[in-house]
């Protein structure tokens, strides 16, 4: 085959092989990248226990039967709800969907709407607001107030503190009027927001909670409202403020507001003797119809609780004081859970989980994996009977993706993840990492990758294309040669015939010359 015919074929082969290598490399890179995806967000930080429970709404903590047995006779209120603030799981519930009057717990929704209006920019904390003429119109004798006078001006922020920590009913009316233009419009917004939060047993008739037949809620709905409210930093700050000073106004001297919540304020003007160092916020409430009500949170050793008590009783003590059931029930619930529950490791970072096959290892064909960090959960005390057996679901990225794990591997390299669950509730997910290094066998690595290269589907397709190109090129050459031969054959025949005719003509001419010169012929 001539040189000029070989060059195009070699060029085609080189181009196809050049295209194959990047495709193979890209495929290998993708395989490596998929073995170590980004860490998930629900892994606990090192040394800091965090709840990672993915619980269905309405699920209970492990050991909740023991909580119920312990607290059923101790708690007196009509409705009680004790919840893990992080996971949303219940420790204890009593009549949480029963209709109840919220009293001043209503103000949680009032403050939530006001805070959301501030966050939207509809109103501002430093706005100057004047108490309008009818702000005391629907008050009853003995209702809590901050002695706000008609025509008195103060900042919108100060009105919020009056409403929340002093439980001032007239301040709620002023806030409602300022945010929505009228109390009726504000109340409509309260009910709309309750529906948005998933409340199904709630209807508000005013922004402060004084008794009305059509003003009611449930402990379950109040949990939904409070959970949303506490997610706003301004709300959390206000409801946990023990003292707040309102500067002198146009009608009043400087006044100091004192939080009614005796859990956080030992000098509460209403409920003394219940101070609890682990408590924060949220709101007290009381009317004759509602009984003594309290929503609060508490945190101890990383365990965070939210407690709702509705319909607590007031019981006379022997010393002439009154025991307020909303507070005593709350403290009983907190103390029992904190003494019987705590953070426990359910998977340790030192646990060896399983062996994962590895290709091209120099000293072995597998690697041991362990959790990247300890997985902890809030569980009953370690000495409780019947410690739960958690289920472990292991996902190895290479096995999931159908691509083998390959050496070299460094200790700490992410190779998968571990999900820990119990009865369908996920208690944590953590990355799995290599526990040791796995060095690579260079010979096996090279041989394996060469074999992998030539068995790669992309390479096989390209090689097939090269073979087909070669076959096609040979067929083209054969056909081309036949075409050329077909053109040349008639020409050669014509040339041969012409040559033969020329020879015949020459011979004929020679004979004629002899015929014209007989003498010459004779001389010869």
PLM feature segments, named:
Residues 199-200, 213-216, 220-465, 469-491:
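Domain-terminus/edge residues, biased toward the C-terminal soluble/receptor-binding domains
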């Amino acid at each position: 085959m001539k040189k000029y015919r070989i060059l195009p074929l070699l060029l085609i082969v080189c181009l196809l092989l050049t295209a194959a290598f990047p495709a193979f490399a890209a495929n290998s890179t993708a395989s490596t990248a998929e073995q170590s995806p980004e860490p998930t967000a629900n892994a606990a930080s090192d040394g800091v226990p965090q709840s990672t429970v993915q619980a269905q709404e309405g699920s209970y903590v492990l050991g909740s039967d023991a909580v119920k047995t312990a607290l059923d006779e101790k708690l007196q209120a009509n409705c009680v709800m004790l919840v893990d603030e992080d996971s949303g799981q219940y420790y204890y519930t009593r009549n949480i969907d029963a209709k109840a009057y919220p009293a001043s717990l209503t103000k949680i929704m009032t403050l939530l709407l006001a805070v959301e209006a501030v966050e939207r920019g509809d109103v501002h904390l430093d706005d100057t607001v004047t108490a309008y003429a009818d702000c005391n119109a629907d008050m009853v004798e003995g209702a809590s107030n901050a002695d706000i006078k008609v025509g008195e001006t103060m900042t919108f922020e100060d009105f919020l503190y009056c409403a929340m920590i002093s439980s001032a009913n007239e301040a709620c009316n002023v806030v409602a009027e300022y945010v929505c233009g009228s109390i009726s419009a504000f109340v409509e917004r309260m009910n709309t927001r309750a529906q948005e939060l998933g409340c199904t047993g709630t209807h508000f008739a005013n922004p402060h909670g004084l008794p009305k037949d059509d003003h009611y809620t449930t402990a379950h709905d109040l949990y939904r409202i409070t959970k949303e409210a506490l997610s706003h930093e301004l709300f959390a700050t206000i409801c946990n403020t023990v003292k707040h000073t309102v500067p002198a106004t146009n009608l009043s001297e400087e006044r100091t507001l004192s939080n009614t919540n005796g859990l956080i304020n030992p000098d509460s003007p209403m409920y003394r003797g219940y101070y609890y160092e682990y408590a924060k916020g949220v709101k007290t409430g009381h009317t004759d119809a509602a009984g003594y009500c309290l929503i609060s949170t508490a945190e101890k050793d990383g365990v965070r609780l939210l407690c709702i008590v509705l319909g607590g009783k007031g019981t006379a003590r022997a010393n002439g004081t009154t025991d307020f059931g909303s507070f005593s029930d709350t403290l009983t619930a907190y103390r029992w859970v904190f003494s019987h529950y705590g953070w426990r490791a359910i998977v340790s970072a030192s646990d060896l989980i399983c062996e994962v096959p590895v290709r091209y290892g120099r000293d072995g064909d597998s690697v041991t994996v362990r959790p990247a960090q300890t997985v902890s959960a809030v569980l009953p005390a370690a000495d409780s009977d019947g410690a739960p057996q958690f289920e472990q679901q292991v996902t190895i990225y290479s096995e999931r993706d159908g691509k083998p794990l390959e050496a070299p591997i460094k200790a700490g390299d992410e190779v998968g993840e571990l999900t820990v669950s119990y009865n369908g509730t996920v208690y944590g997910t953590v990355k799995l990492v290599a526990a040791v290094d796995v060095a690579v066998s260079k010979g096996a690595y090279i041989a394996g990758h060469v074999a992998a290269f030539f068995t790669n589907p992309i390479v096989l397709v390209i090689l097939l294309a090269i073979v087909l190109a070669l076959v096609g090129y040979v067929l083209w050459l054969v056909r081309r040669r036949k075409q050329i031969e077909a053109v040349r054959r008639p020409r050669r025949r014509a040339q041969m015939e012409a040559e033969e005719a020329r020879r015949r003509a020459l011979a004929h001419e020679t004979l004629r010359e002899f015929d014209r010169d007989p003498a010459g012929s004779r001389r010869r």
